[in-house]
UniProtKB/Swiss-Prot annotation:
The gene is fusA. Catalyzes the GTP-dependent ribosomal translocation step during translation elongation. During this step, the ribosome changes from the pre-translocational (PRE) to the post-translocational (POST) state as the newly formed A-site-bound peptidyl-tRNA and P-site-bound deacylated tRNA move to the P and E sites, respectively. Catalyzes the coordinated movement of the two tRNA molecules, the mRNA and conformational changes in the ribosome. This is Elongation factor G. Residues 11-287 form the tr-type G domain. Its main location: cytoplasm. One of its GO terms (cellular component) is cytoplasm. It holds the Pfam family EFG_III. GO terms for biological process: ribosome disassembly. One of its GO terms (molecular function) is translation elongation factor activity. Keywords: Cytoplasm, Elongation factor, GTP-binding, Nucleotide-binding, Protein biosynthesis.
């Protein structure tokens, strides 16, 4: 078997991803690739819920891909490592981390829909990491499929320059094959060839000859411009050889100047093998990618590089963690330089901790092929790493390097989750810890006010699936609340000399404490939200009781005076008071401190504050009006508008409470072509009418 040479000759290796909109047929395409490369003996269909890379139960049920499974396969003695990435907006973290470790990608488009919003978003993420791509126009057998329309949308919506290297023969039900513009031959799948393994190479059909010539000329012009020798040859009227054309297309693709466009129907098994040839012919090998940059641990200015060679010191990036039913934690790594054997010790240079590599596997979706050593340019799954999380670098202990990590957005939506029984409580803890290891965008905190566990994520679908996984993989039964907003309360004016006397003198030891305070709005340095100042003179209140007044005031602040939300940004000044030799105690002054704060706050114009989000919507020009109108109706304030890669970007500040369900509304208003991101910006006062509703809801009136 030629697998041995592949491990040493990196020219024959391709690390690629398959990226696309949610329904363009990524997973079906991946399945076909695995079938033709001989890894699978039975074709799995997304329709039947049996595809190889969708190995979580929910993926098979929902027919979408959530996690990126890494699969290794061979094609004409070349090794292709494929990462199947999800196309749904809530799983951007999966897409980001796959793109970070890929050398190239196949962008799959739906031949009827053209470039869809999710494709725009994933395309922009690929631009961010500068990943070379080839485009595969899929579903050419579908009603209404239009190859030329799709190519136009690649130009218009993505602002990219497509290079058409194949044309379809027929369309919809009559789609029977492709014209290869490089070799100027037709490749035809006749009849219902059971699995499309056999195709005939024929002359181009007469009725398509003109169209083929027109596109061939465009192709040759683009190719000739890459090199002066080719340019002279082309204008001198000489034929360019197939090798010369392929070499030039490869150069253009690797430099991300142009994106070759192919077509086919993965489901009908047409056009997949030529697409595999294109992956090998045009996408970069690990050697085409420049050496990776990193820095010395703890010294970010000292840059070092590692070349993609086995002779360099070992370095690798952990890009994904998955929980495996038998092995526990699997860490997926991309090795950038050097080699390492299973069982050796390496260092996690991001955290400065030693790690021992247990077993090493090359993965095939969820079957594992054990290997003895990991070497540069490949992707592996490792067992036995304890402290390594997504984005960490593993390196040779004597020659450490920290590679550039990945950036993950903060959660935008939170729900409270309560275990149904005591035994679920313990399981929930384990489940949350495991899921947080796998998914850096999943965050958890304990709500001090309600004692509930609150989980946060990238969107409603994201949280649905996480809760679903808790139920399935960890057998946790839990009730999930509605998405919540964290309000706060504060005061707007200063009140002076508010007095409160706490006394209880009916038989036995009594209680007595008298306090006098000023209360005023306050905003401290470095975000402090409370200050207590003592101005009592002449021992009017004994020293030991003063901290009790402070503690009482802080207790009262936890449940404000309007709707029970925490009171923030206040300053308490203790001016005067009185005590009783026998009846005063710490307890008495604590009660007095608490009551006087409530009394003062009620007089100081209390208001409710709400979290305001900075929202950024990227939309095609045609939907600008709808998007802006919709944001205004959500009490949003438009801050700015700009243009970016053929799309419009609207920036606005919108209260979080108005943003629930926005994903769905935005999709329906823009036919799914817009997308948005939001991050927390600040707290701001709630308008009076909204404030009334919040108070009524909280006090049950």
């Amino acid at each position: 078997m030629a697998q041995k040479d592949v491990l040493t000759d990196l020219n024959k290796v391709r690390n690629i991803g398959i990226m696309a909109h949610i329904d363009a047929g990524k997973t079906t395409t991946t399945e076909r690739i695995l079938y033709y490369t001989g890894v699978n003996y039975k074709i799995g269909e997304t329709h039947d819920g049996a595809s190889t890379t969708d190995w979580m139960e929910q993926e098979q049920e929902r027919g979408i891909t959530i996690t990126s499974a890494a699969v290794t396969c061979f094609w004409n003695d070349n090794q292709i490592n494929i990462i199947d990435t999800p196309g749904h907006v809530d799983f951007t973290v999966e897409v980001e981390r796959s793109l970070r470790v890929l050398d190239g990608a196949v962008a799959v488009f739906d031949g009827k829909e053209g470039v869809e919003p999710q494709s725009e978003q994933v395309w922009r993420q690929a631009d961010k990491y500068d990943v070379p791509r080839i485009c595969f126009v899929n579903k050419m057998d579908k009603l209404g499929a239009d190859f030329y329309f799709t190519v136009r949308t690649i130009e218009e919506r993505l602002g990219a320059t497509p290079l058409v290297i194949q044309l379809p023969i027929g369309a919809e039900n009559d789609f029977i094959g492709i014209i290869d513009l490089v070799e100027m031959k037709a490749k035809v799948w006749r009849g219902e060839t059971a699995l499309g393994e056999k195709y005939e190479v024929e002359d181009i059909p007469a009725e398509l000859a003109d169209k083929a010539d027109e596109y061939r000329t465009k192709l040759l012009e683009a190719v000739a411009e890459t090199d002066e020798a080719l340019l002279e040859k082309y204008f001198g009227g000489e034929e360019l050889t197939v090798e010369e054309i392929k070499g030039a297309i490869r150069k253009l693709t690797v430099n991300s100047e142009l994106y070759p466009v192919l077509c086919g129907s993965a489901f009908k098994n047409k056009g997949v093998q030529p697409m595999l040839d294109a992956v090998v012919d045009y996408l970069p090998s690990p050697l085409d990618v420049e050496s990776v940059q990193g820095h010395v641990p703890n010294k970010e200015d000292e840059l070092i590089t590692r070349k993609p060679s086995v002779d360099e010191p070992f370095s690798a990036l952990a890009f994904k963690i998955a929980v495996h039913p038998f092995f526990g934690k699997l860490t997926y790594v991309r090795v950038y330089s050097g080699t390492v054997e299973s069982g050796s010790q390496v260092i996690n240079s991001t955290k400065g901790k030693k790690e021992r590599l247990g077993k090493l596997f090359q993965m095939h979706a969820n079957k594992e092929n054990p290997v003895e050593r990991a070497s540069a340019g490949h992707i592996y799954a490792v067992i036995g790493l304890k402290d390594t999380t997504t984005g960490d670098t593993l390196s040779d202990a004597n020659q450490q390097i920290v590679l550039e990590s990945m950036t993950f957005p903060d959660p935008v939506i939170e729900v409270a989750i309560e275990p149904k029984t005591k035994s679920d409580q313990e399981k929930l803890g384990t489940a949350i810890q495991k899921l947080a290891e796998e998914d850096p965008t999943f965050k958890v905190h304990l709500d001090q006010e309600t004692g509930q566990t609150v989980i946060g994520g990238m969107g409603e679908l994201h949280l649905d699936i996480l809760v679903d996984r808790m139920r399935r993989e960890f057998k946790v039964e839990a009730n999930v609340g509605k998405p919540q907003v964290a309000y706060r309360e504060t005061i707007k004016r200063k009140v002076e000399k508010v007095e409160f006397t706490h006394k209880k003198q009916t038989g036995g030891s009594g209680q007595f404490a008298k306090v006098l305070i000023d209360l005023e709005p306050f905003s401290g340095e470095d975000g402090a939200t409370y200050e207590f100042e003592n101005k009592v003179t002449g021992g009017r209140i004994p020293r030991e009781y003063i901290p009790s007044v402070d503690a009482g005031a802080q207790d009262a602040m936890q449940y404000g005076v309007l709707a029970g939300y925490p009171l923030v940004n206040v300053k308490v000044t203790l001016l005067d008071g009185a005590y009783h030799e026998v009846d005063s105690s710490e307890m008495a002054f604590k009660v007095a401190g608490s009551q006087v704060l409530k009394k003062a706050a009620q007089a100081a114009q209390p208001v409710i504050l709400e979290p305001i989000m900075a929202v950024e919507v990227t939309t095609p020009e045609d939907y600008m009006g709808e998007v802006i109108g919709d944001l205004n109706s959500r009490r949003g304030q438009i801050q700015a508008m700009e243009e970016r890669a053929g799309a419009r970007v609207v920036k606005a500040q919108v209260p979080l409470s108005e943003m629930f369900g926005y994903v769905g509304d935005l999709r329906s208003k823009t036919q799914g072509r817009a997308n948005y991101s939001m991050v927390f910006d600040s707290y701001a006062e709630v308008p009076a009418n909204v404030s009334k509703e919040i108070i009524a809801k909280a006090t049950g009136q």
